[in-house]
Amino acid sequence: MNESGSIGIIETKYAEFKELPLKNGSVLSPVVIAYETYGTLSPSKNNAILICHALSGDAHAAGYHSESDKKPGWWDDYIGPGKSFDTNQYFIICSNVIGGCKGSSGPLSIHPKTGTPYGSRFPFVSIQDMVKAQKLLVEFLGIDKLFCVAGGSMGGMQALEWSIAYPDSLLNCIVMASTAEHSAMQIAFNEVGRQAILSDPNWNNGLYDENSPRKGLALARMVGHITYLSDDKMREKFGRNPPRGNILTTDFAVGSYLIYQGESFVDRFDANSYIYVTKALDHYSLGKGKELTAALSTATCRFLIVSYSSDWLYPPAQSREIVKSLEAADKRVFYLELQSGEGHDSFLLKNPKQIEILKGFLENQSSP
């Protein structure tokens, strides 16, 4: 554990609710939400910021769970004392999405009627349902209005949904490396990943036991991880270099890297959750053009939209579509395209300019 600039040891907490009506008409009952908080809620409860995670993320956004942890939470560079999301000033909340596998209700949860994991019997959940569950948590914490909702990638979709589903419940919205709907190409990559899982001999219609479809999930992660990088970064890091390990397994260093990414992913993620969450991403759509403008017209908060020059998964053009529609709806929006060679994952990586942009946007709003 490296405590330099960190908020230290953090405990994941759990909130349980009786039920959650879902968009498709079914009801999830009970509902458990795993979450973490950083900083102190002000007496007037007006300094709360909700951080929404991406596909493979979780509630552990900052700090460490134990002194033996080698790495902090996934956005530790941005959350903490004096950082972009300053815990000396703000009360930060991050929760695991429902349908995920990091403590919130999902396919790994025990079905109350069978006493066994839901597996593929878990109901389909949407981005709207994820946000609805977050709203339950925010109300449980006694907060009526959030100072800001922020997220990148899938987290950006959740932030957008917050702005239109609960317009009176947030003052600011930060959307990074995201989109208002998936393109055919983005859906295609997710479909290949899902088919890899479905083709695994251990799939068993999603009702697998400890013999889970690890090979299929590893392949899905390999495909997905390619989209998080950039051509320049891959050329710089790997080129056409040979692997260090078994040359019968792969001929190039980039192949060895992707195999490692896939194999390490299966130890921390669930195949069913991968299917559920990617489907939620693919089905989310606020439309284009006038339809998108109309969808965003109910929002009342300020927006910061950030894109990245080398992001080919959610290219800058998709962020500019959001900005154009927000402007057409006469909303207050700030837009920045950051030059970065890191691809889609740029929003996760430490970047002094990004740190200052986020901090400046929050500080230039009405003080909490």
Curated annotation (Swiss-Prot):
Its EC number is 2.3.1.31. This is Homoserine O-acetyltransferase. GO terms for cellular component: cytoplasm. It catalyses: L-homoserine + acetyl-CoA = O-acetyl-L-homoserine + CoA. Belongs to the AB hydrolase superfamily. MetX family. Pathway: Amino-acid biosynthesis; L-methionine biosynthesis via de novo pathway; O-acetyl-L-homoserine from L-homoserine: step 1/1. It comes from Leptospira borgpetersenii serovar Hardjo-bovis (strain JB197). Substrate binds at R221, D345. Residues 47-349 form the AB hydrolase-1 domain.
